[in-house]
A protein has these predicted regions:
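Conserved acidic catalytic loop of the alpha/beta-hydrolase fold
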Residues: 78-96
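Conserved HGGG/HGGXW glycine-rich cap/lid loop of the alpha/beta-hydrolase fold
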Residues: 23-69
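Short beta-strand/loop motif that positions the catalytic acidic residue
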Residues: 224, 230-232, 236
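Flexible "cap/lid" loop of the alpha/beta hydrolase fold
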Residues: 122-154
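Gly/Ala-rich beta-loop-alpha elbow adjacent to hydrolase catalytic centers
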Residues: 100-104, 108
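Conserved alpha/beta-hydrolase "acid-adjacent" motif
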Residues: 237-243
């Protein structure tokens, strides 16, 4: 598992504005990872599948997260174009895969759809699809708790709870990220995994990004021509499995891999090594055959 420290990032000013990004340089091949809500470029869970395949990782902070202003790109298609410019700026003429995790899924789809000459493959993990999301009640509640004015208080309270009573804090958070009971999900995590999640949740911030994620978005799945791998769990409480089914139905060359995770963090499931092998095979497959 990745060490518990935030990775160093860089800021570059492109035509649309400043962009924060992390570049873990390895081999010539590169994947572009779009993280989900409350995340930024320097935060990550498990990217060993890319390291094992000698693949570099480029991870930009999406609009409103980290040090990328919400005005840079702003919309899903807009930031897809910003990312294409970032790739050109860094000298990447081909991207082995666009990887979209959770709320980063729509941007990965747009990146692949709008830049087929750049992006070779698409990987979507627990990703939002073309279905409406979230429901009205959740949208209103999230708008109150994670607006730019209130998100600091919300996350400050959560950090305090995680320091004082980490298991209680994890139960509260997992209740919204899993369909099984939170006590059951927590019991299935190892002590190291619990420590890792406490570390991750304690560093999350929403900035102006989460409210931006709640904006309506166009369905671009039918415009994706590249092969795609969609990874999803029926017990994911954050993103319903129906989103994965809609993605596979909409993307002409998509395959669905079902995770057995009890929650939104598939990297902690027992079948993650098997899924990682599938991802590695997908990344290294010959696309000309």
């Amino acid at each position: 598992m990745t060490s518990m420290m935030e990775r160093p990032t860089t800021i570059v000013t492109l035509s649309a504005g400043p962009v924060e990004y992390r570049l873990d340089q390895r081999g010539a091949a590169v994947v572009v990872v779009f993280h989900g809500g409350h995340m930024r470029a320097g935060l990550t869970l498990d990217e060993r599948v890319y390291a094992d395949a000698d693949i570099s990782v480029l991870a930009p902070s999406r609009p409103g997260y980290g040090r990328t202003p919400v005005t840079t790109g702003t919309t899903v298609p807009g930031f897809a174009d910003v990312t294409a410019e970032l790739c050109r700026h860094l000298g990447f003429e081909r991207v082995t895969a666009a990887v979209g995790i959770s709320a980063g899924g729509p941007t990965a789809v747009a990146f692949a759809a709008r830049h087929p000459d750049l992006v070779e493959r698409l990987i979507l993990q627990g990703a939002l699809g073309p279905l409406p999301y979230p429901d009205r009640r959740t949208r209103l509640l999230a708008g109150l708790m994670f607006s730019p004015r209130t998100e600091g208080v919300t996350w400050g309270g959560m950090r305090s709870l995680l320091r004082r009573a980490p298991d209680r804090g994890l139960r509260q958070l997992l209740a919204g990220l899993a369909t099984p009971p939170a006590d059951q999900v927590l019991a299935g995590l190892t002590p190291a995994q619990r420590t890792r999640l406490v570390w991750l949740f304690s560093r999350m911030r929403s900035g102006a990004g989460f409210r931006n994620d709640l904006r309506p978005r166009d369905d671009l799945t039918g415009q994706v021509t590249q092969p795609a791998l969609v990874i999803a769990s029926r017990r994911d409480g954050a993103v319903p499995f129906a989103h994965a089914e809609a993605l596979v139905a909409g993307i002409p060359r998509a395959d669905l891999i079902e995770s057995q995770a009890d929650h939104h963090f598939y990297e902690f499931a027992a079948d993650w090594p098997t899924i990682s092998d599938t991802v590695r095979d997908f990344l290294t497959a010959d696309l000309t055959s």
